[in-house]
Amino acid sequence: MKVRASVKKICRNCKIVRRNGVVRVICSDGRHKQRQG
């Protein structure tokens, strides 16, 4: 999980999801997981 000021899609499998007011990227590639912080 990377914590970044700006989350971006890295590949075409990445999806931007908002959970409890937190922006996240979920992907089939675990290395692409990100959270805005």
Curated annotation (Swiss-Prot):
InterPro entries: Ribosomal_bL36, Ribosomal_bL36_sp. Pfam families: Ribosomal_L36. GO terms for biological process: translation. Keywords: Ribonucleoprotein, Ribosomal protein. The keyword Manganese does not apply. GO terms for cellular component: cytoplasm; ribonucleoprotein complex; ribosome. GO terms for molecular function: structural constituent of ribosome. Belongs to the bacterial ribosomal protein bL36 family. This is Large ribosomal subunit protein bL36. It comes from Alkalilimnicola ehrlichii (strain ATCC BAA-1101 / DSM 17681 / MLHE-1).
